[in-house]
Amino acid sequence: MVTILSTPLSPRLTFLCETKLSLSRSNRSVCCSLSEEPKDQCLSRRSLVYVLVASPCLLLPALSSSAKTKSKSPYDERRLLEQNKRIQRENNAPDEFPNFVREGFEVKVLASDNYIKADSGLIYRDFNVGQGDFPKDGQQVTFHYIGYNESGRRIDSTYIQGSPARIRMGTNALVPGFEMGIRDMKPGGRRRIIIPPELGPPVGPSTFFSSKQFEVFDVELLSIQNCERRTIIGFYSDVTCS
């Protein structure tokens, strides 16, 4: 079992404080130091991938996310974990879905050792590797996906919509975490991608997303097509993929 703590704040700042008390109540001192960690290099129906799309989870040791977060007792953490598991069962979350223990800005993600955390902060697990080459910039990828929120509730699915999504790589058509997640997939591959807030979509009144959360996607890469730009009558051009 591996854990990671994440926060939407970047770069992360960690305060280390030590309070010293002498035998005399009047003599008290507090020593603090500030350290900075380096920065880490569903969906509205079909529109997620295209809002996923058109607008711009764990593994490894735990990382501190907030200086003001009170330390939780093991009992509090177990209680929050059981609460998250209960909600995921009610939402019919898929097997081995990661658990999220959230308190304020601090999020602890719990998952099996089958998950891998990339240097970028993206977390993924391959269920089937597939065969062939990885997609390149300019190529079109065709894929199915199911999107979930932290509580395991399904927020979108191309399977339900009845047709897969098609996106050209390297055109900023996907949020960073989603494109990173499929960039090293092969046709026929199936992968679960856990996108941390810093690699996810923007939030706010003008977007589909109201708060910074981890997003989870089960992705099946169907095919990769080459694309070329053609010019018609000297001034109009478009891109065709086959």
Curated annotation (Swiss-Prot):
Documented EC number(s): 5.2.1.8
Location in or out of the cell: Plastid, Chloroplast thylakoid lumen
GO molecular function terms attached to this record: oxidoreductase activity; peptidyl-prolyl cis-trans isomerase activity
Transit peptide feature, positions: 1-31, 32-67
RNA-binding keyword on record: no
Signal sequence, renumbered to the chain: none
SUPFAM superfamilies: FKBP-like (SSF54534)
One cellular component term from this protein's GO annotations in UniProt: thylakoid
Source organism superkingdom: Eukaryota
Disulphide-bonded residues: C227-C241
Group of enzyme by EC: isomerase
GO biological process: photosystem II assembly
Major subcellular site: plastid
Function: PPIases accelerate the folding of proteins. It catalyzes the cis-trans isomerization of proline imidic peptide bonds in oligopeptides. Involved in the accumulation of the PSII complex.
Cited PANTHER family: PEPTIDYL-PROLYL CIS-TRANS ISOMERASE FKBP20-2, CHLOROPLASTIC
Quaternary assembly: Interacts in vitro with LTO1.
Name this protein carries in UniProt: Peptidyl-prolyl cis-trans isomerase FKBP20-2, chloroplastic
Organism: Arabidopsis thaliana (Mouse-ear cress)
Gene name per UniProt: FKBP20-2
